Amino acid sequence: MKESRSEPGDDPSGLSAEEMVWAEGLPQRRAVQFRRSRLWMRSCLASLHGCSTEEVPLTAPPGAPPLLAPGWGYISLSHCVDACLLAWSLQPVGVDLERADRVFPADALVRRFFTGAERSALLDLQGERLRREVLDRWLIKEAAIKWQRGSLASDLRFWEVSPCLGWARHGGLAVEIASELRSQGDWRLAVAVTDNQSLQDCRLCLA
């Protein structure tokens, strides 16, 4: 899995006509974020495919998972308060990104959303160790749901992360996929793909 850093641009000429229309329908601050994120995505993908940003067949309306045209691979997008992550693969892929120091009610999340096996493994932990372990599993679960093109509301309770954190299984669909965690600066990220070979082929772009 290869990783690169790229900063968002500001030149709206790199956007598609459809993206310009979508941006015009958003509040000003959200429109700026939308334009910059789509320009950045196009820049990352153009660099990967060796084409211009305008040639990238990207469909990424506000609030919806981004898609590439058939034959261009699969992508997944995640963002937190101060960073964005884009993943590309020849096979379906999902990513999730969070600040490594994010504070949240770890005990409550485990009790409400995690499987019985996960609760048994985690609820004896306390403090910072519990927070880190829950964050890692939450990242993998969200990445897996994006890989699935599912939803948190419908699928979160079905995804169980392995003790080694190297795979996740959907209990309702009887599907098992590969996962990988990484640290990058102030952030923690997870990638979910069909199998371990797809992990090797995956490309990441962080901004």
Language-model-detected regions and their locations in the chain:
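Core catalytic alpha/beta fold that binds nucleotide/phospho-ligands
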Residues: 1-207
